[in-house]
From Swiss-Prot:
Pathways involved: Cofactor biosynthesis; adenosylcobalamin biosynthesis; cob(II)yrinate a,c-diamide from sirohydrochlorin (anaerobic route): step 6/10
SUPFAM superfamilies: CbiD-like
UniProt record, GO biological process: anaerobic cobalamin biosynthetic process; methylation
Family, as annotated: Belongs to the CbiD family.
Record flagged with keyword S-adenosyl-L-methionine: yes
Lineage of the species this protein comes from: Bacteria, Bacillati, Cyanobacteriota, Cyanophyceae, Synechococcales
EC number(s) recorded for this UniProt protein: 2.1.1.195
Gene that encodes the chain: cbiD
Protein name: Cobalt-precorrin-5B C(1)-methyltransferase
Catalysed reactions, semicolon-separated: Co-precorrin-5B + S-adenosyl-L-methionine = Co-precorrin-6A + S-adenosyl-L-homocysteine
Keywords for the protein's UniProt record, in alphabetical order: Cobalamin biosynthesis, Methyltransferase, S-adenosyl-L-methionine, Transferase
GO molecular function: cobalt-precorrin-5B C1-methyltransferase activity
One protein family per Pfam: CbiD
Amino acid sequence: MKKGFSLPLWVTGAAKSAVKKLTGLPFEDYELIKIPNDKNLIKIKVHSAGLIKDESHALGISFADSGLDLDVTQNLEIWTIAFLEKTYEKDNNSLDLINIIPGYGVGIDQKTSEICISKFAKEVLFENLLEILPAGYKLNLEIIFPNGKFLAERTSNQSFGIVQGLSIIGTSAETFSSASPDQLKNAKAQLEKIVSHDFYETIIFVIGENGLHLAKSSNIKFPIIKVGNWIGPLLVDAALKKIKRVILFGYHGKLIKLAGGIFHTHNHLADARIEILVYLAVKEEVPIEMIKKLSLASNVEDALLLLESSSPSLADKLWNKLSDTVEKRSSEYLKRYITTDMKVAAIIFDRQRKIRWSGDNGKDYISSFKGF
């Protein structure tokens, strides 16, 4: 598989080139990017950089190469506009020296209007830009994705309360397809590292970037691993490594598949989400007219909205049942391959990234996730 790098690195490459141009340094067609807590430097190609607005601002441009042909950010055009502002504060906190501004095509939180950017992305930007920032100045950095608003329509961003464009929520330097063997290999390596350094009785498996971002924003102290679509094999690997508890944390659109016994969750391999929901609705004796409506829903999110508009208590009952079924099916899956006492807990959030449901095992932990 072709190697690629996550969106934060390409944004940082363009930004670093713009700041250097603004401070009088010559343009280079690549930038060496530092990664927090990593000695290696990553070479990021930059398309161009130049002075604009009477030479008071600089524009840096790069094109993201995630290495993933189907990734929405592959070949994404990135603009970063840098502007230096004199500061007279002697003891400025370094966090105050860079102001990141969401420009056109960059996702913002629907409730707060703040830029949707991960902790990792901020750390990469600050790590690389603070060292080239002239003394006595602060940096205003506007990030623009010219095609971001259009491309965001192909994502589930809006379902998570992210509007106006694409979020910058990469959480590692390298990229892996969630369905590729490299993703499985990387997750197994993370699990091995966690177990070999410190013995943890409980770990958290998250499915996608939104789940990872949400989990890392909480006060949970357990190790967190992004498992992509390889949930089944990684549950077995965790049991083999004598982990006591695994908390499955994710969006209902993914975790619902586990309730149907589907443990490789990529959509091109298996979907059946509506069918699984209808099956659970029958088991819970949901009125037949509602079951008919659920079966005609175009997606799980529409089905949930339909349920909640009709009966919020019934919706909660069904989704808690789903969470409980995820836990039970996970235990049954493990027993096919290994004799183990490992507990599997399920905690599920909705499209607004609100943590809402859990199975019986997850009830012991859901309050900790909500407490942030």
